[in-house]
């Protein structure tokens, strides 16, 4: 009798699995927005904050297959926002092994807009998309937006620690360290602004990275050195084909070059190297995006108040204005300049913007971009 029951359970399990359906990553129902590695269409790889997989779905639920190329530590894992009809419905936690995550839609009679949005940055882990499993339902491709914006930036752009709010000393201590679970690039200023402008969003951002040197004074893996890659992560690299073709590129980098000035004695930032590297970087950007308008953004995380007498914000501003003036002479692209207000407390992790501060950054730059682009 026990053997008969076991056989029935096995057959039942087989029949249940056999009626399931699957859509491979190669299906044309998927829109891949941002930098994706489509070399293997059975396992699509991506790493940057804000990489999106979009489609439309009519049905009750589906399951999305994902895994991380990582050990799964607290700093080395991904989180994904699942957006249904413009609202975040759930958050999926990445795993080092393939896992299918159930996404409840409850839309049996009409198509819903679905977006899988990578909220953690490239430094956390490369993600792999394995496709979708479902029992019943229909899928359609979403139409592309008419506008495309590429954002190039640092920890501010990728939402470092923005899900917490910590008072400045003596009430609190924002020097908390990085935790992937507290990072959400969907609620960072670049993504917020792009949604308001109804533009496809592509993000190339790395915490701690600078123009010619990084926050820790190292010069490996600076933003200009990583820009031409679809992703990089612990020795895994893939060149990018520049297929996004943005109408607008917003560059908000350079703050981390001043990180060495927090040392005692301060390791001063080299103005000549800063300007030369920025111009060389713009040469690369304009070569691959000859028709894009470009905005050079400063501010946000630097002030003239600390460290005393270094005037870091004023120097940063003046150097980028030199870059802008020379760029107008050297490049045919239309180039603008924008300055964010300095952030105020409370802070996210390690003195970064909170959700409220990120919204303020978006509110500041959005009117400027509307005018700059005549949108």
Model-derived features: where do they sit?
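Solvent-exposed loop/turn segments at secondary-structure junctions
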Residues: 70, 155-158, 206-211, 255-260, ...
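Histidine-centered active-site loop/cap adjacent to the catalytic His
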Residues: 185, 349-375
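Substrate-gating cap/lid alpha-helix
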Residues: 295-340, 351, 355-361
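Generic structural signal for well-ordered alpha-helices
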Residues: 278-282, 320
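Structural recognition of the beta-strand scaffold that forms the well-ordered cores
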Residues: 148-152, 157, 201-205, 247-252, ...
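N-terminal secretory targeting modules
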Residues: 10, 17-152, 156-185
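Conserved SGNH/GDSL esterase-like catalytic core that processes O-acyl groups on lipids
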Residues: 48-50, 124, 173-268, 272, ...
């Amino acid at each position: 009798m026990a053997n008969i029951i076991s056989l029935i359970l096995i057959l039942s399990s087989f029949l249940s699995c056999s009626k399931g359906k699957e859509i491979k990553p190669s299906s044309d129902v998927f829109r891949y927005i941002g930098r994706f590695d489509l070399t293997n269409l059975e396992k699509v790889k991506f790493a940057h904050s804000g990489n999106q997989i979009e489609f439309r779905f009519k049905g009750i639920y589906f399951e999305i297959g994902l895994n991380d190329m990582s050990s799964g530590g607290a700093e080395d894992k991904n989180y994904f926002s699942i957006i249904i009809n413009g609202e975040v419905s759930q958050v999926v936690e990445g795993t080092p092994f393939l896992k299918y995550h159930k996404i409840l839609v409850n839309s049996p009679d009409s198509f819903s807009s679905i977006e899988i949005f990578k909220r953690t940055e490239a430094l956390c882990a490369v993600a792999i998309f394995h496709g979708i499993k479902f029992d019943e339902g229909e899928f359609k491709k979403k139409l592309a937006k008419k506008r495309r914006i590429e954002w190039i930036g640092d920890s501010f752009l990728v939402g470092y620690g923005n899900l917490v709010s910590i008072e400045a000393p003596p009430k609190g201590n924002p020097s908390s360290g990085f935790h992937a679970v507290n990072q959400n690039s969907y609620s960072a200023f670049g993504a917020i602004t792009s949604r308001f402008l109804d533009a496809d969003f592509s993000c190339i951002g790395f915490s701690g990275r600078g123009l010619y040197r990084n926050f820790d004074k190292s010069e490996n893996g600076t933003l200009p050195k990583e820009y031409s890659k679809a992703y990089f992560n612990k020795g895994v690299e893939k060149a990018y084909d520049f297929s996004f073709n943005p109408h607008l590129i917003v560059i908000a980098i350079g703050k981390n070059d001043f990180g060495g000035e927090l040392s005692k004695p301060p390791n001063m930032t080299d103005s000549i190297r800063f300007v030369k590297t920025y111009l060389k970087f713009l040469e690369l950007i304009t070569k691959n995006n000859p028709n894009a308008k470009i905005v050079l953004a400063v501010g946000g995380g630097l002030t003239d108040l600390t460290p005393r007498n270094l005037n870091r914000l004023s120097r940063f501003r003046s150097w980028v204005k030199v870059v802008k003036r020379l760029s107008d002479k050297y490049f045919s692209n239309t180039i603008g300049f924008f300055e964010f207000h300095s952030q105020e407390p409370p802070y996210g992790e390690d003195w970064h913007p909170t959700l409220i501060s990120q919204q303020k950054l978006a509110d500041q730059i959005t009117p400027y971009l509307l005018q700059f682009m005549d949108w």
